[in-house]
């Protein structure tokens, strides 16, 4: 086979990025090289997202852009991921210019298209800066949230064995990874299927022992499986950051019940109490959905009040997406007008911006450990990094004033001087 240049495009969440990195590893052969420029590629491989409308639109737009590049050339286009899992037949009919649509169960066979025999033990190639990487600990989800298409796409919850995850984490540490980002569809449910009981703590204890790993960050915790012992465990750890991502989706019992979330507002208050008791410096990133079909103006106002009370450090706000195949799609009409949904989104976004800004102002004068991610595009010598309070490429940044040279991946002491905007701050290296 002739030498080939492949351009990978990974859309959607970090879990999808891990899948892409695994594919890159499987295709990492002598006669194959990778390029960030789709125009110079022989093959464009797109790993799509497809669980809500904006994600589907982005995936379709990306595919169509690739189709334009294919015109008058011999390029091949391969499309895989969640969008293909949901709509393979429709995509094959509507976009025949794509050479291969590969669903999730056949993703591991993509190397065969390049005359490469699939291997089980191929190491993934990380695409993030070498000091930070994701560790996907499970696949699929056992929850049946009424609005969510993920169980239909990704299937039931399937935990990876602790031994395999420790081996993968050691491999990442040997590459230079210092920050290990734990991702899955439901991180706090880890282990139930394999071991018959929750095993997240046991997994984390193994990961903490790995030389080179300095920070462990937890994403995608589900409120119903977060308990008091969780916060006690975090308090006693030296490597697990006081940062959690825990989507609540709504605060009101009526909506939570209809969403089939498995908890009520009382549990959210409990979680906030445990956080204050054991880890008062804990940063919480959450997310909410506005415009759910049964959400009244009163429900919306109550959720605003709860958000003001909860004082989340970071909050993603999403408009309800009416997804076919979900319980909410079967049960309800998408009756709240788009204009009204946008109004609600904007109101909560503005509320959260003020909360985040005040949180950042409270950091002024404090000394924090900062991991350096890179350098400013405007001022090339100005390092940019994050404290424990910010996830990579998601939350706000820390601009670091320093007279000493620093490298990407360094963890240095920085005293926060001021806020730059609602999300970012500036500090001085100690």
Curated annotation (Swiss-Prot):
One of its GO terms (cellular component) is cytosol. The keyword Iron-sulfur applies. [4Fe-4S] cluster 2 binds at residues 141, 145, 148. [4Fe-4S] cluster 1 binds at residues 13, 49, 82. Keywords: 4Fe-4S, Cytoplasm, Iron, Iron-sulfur, Metal-binding, S-adenosyl-L-methionine, Transferase. InterPro entries: Elp3/MiaA/NifB-like_rSAM, Methylthiotransferase, Methylthiotransferase_CS, Methylthiotransferase_N, Methylthiotransferase_N_sf, NA-bd_OB-fold, Ribosomal_uS12_MeSTrfase_RimO, rSAM. Its cofactor is [4Fe-4S] cluster. Its main location: cytoplasm. Residues 4-119 form the MTTase N-terminal domain. Signal peptide: none annotated. Residues 361-430 form the TRAM domain. It is an enzyme of class 2 (transferase). GO terms for biological process: tRNA modification. It is found in: Cytoplasm. Its EC number is 2.8.4.4. It catalyses: L-aspartate(89)-[ribosomal protein uS12]-hydrogen + (sulfur carrier)-SH + AH2 + 2 S-adenosyl-L-methionine = 3-methylsulfanyl-L-aspartate(89)-[ribosomal protein uS12]-hydrogen + (sulfur carrier)-H + 5'-deoxyadenosine + L-methionine + A + S-adenosyl-L-homocysteine + 2 H(+). Residues 127-358 form the Radical SAM core domain. NCBIfam families: 30S ribosomal protein S12 methylthiotransferase RimO (TIGR01125), MiaB/RimO family radical SAM methylthiotransferase (TIGR00089). Belongs to the methylthiotransferase family. RimO subfamily. Catalyzes the methylthiolation of an aspartic acid residue of ribosomal protein uS12. This is Ribosomal protein uS12 methylthiotransferase RimO. It comes from Sulfurihydrogenibium sp. (strain YO3AOP1).
